[in-house]
């Protein structure tokens, strides 16, 4: 993912109001809307898609993990947060909609972490 100009993610501002997510799952609704707007697939039944589809998500997560590692090594907390946000967006949003797990992710998370 291309880097933007210097980010501060609200570190220098008052705390932003937190959104309320549908089904308690951040990023999924945003990705669903993005996909619909730009003609990308939203799957609603659990599936393993073709390799070219899941390979994109896999490669994207690896890229963001590398950016996270570099940010930690550089002591750059803003870039750490940027990488963590990208990892969450891709994992929860893209991964969930790609695999048709929108209605399954939150109950599964609660069970695994509960």
Language model region names:
Residues 2-114:
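Flexible "arm" and connector segments at domain edges
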């Amino acid at each position: 993912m291309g880097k933007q100009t210097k980010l501060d993610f609200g570190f220098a501002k008052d705390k932003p109001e937190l959104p309320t997510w549908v089904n308690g799952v951040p990023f999924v609704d945003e990705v669903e809307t993005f996909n619909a707007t730009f003609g990308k697939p939203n799957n609603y039944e659990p599936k393993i898609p073709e390799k070219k589809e899941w390979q994109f998500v896999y490669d994207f997560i690896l890229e963001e993990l590398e950016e996270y590692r570099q940010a930690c090594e550089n002591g750059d907390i803003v870039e750490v947060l940027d990488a963590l946000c990208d990892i969450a967006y891709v994992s929860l949003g893209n991964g969930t909609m790609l695999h048709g797990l929108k209605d399954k992710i939150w109950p599964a998370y609660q069970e695994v972490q509960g």
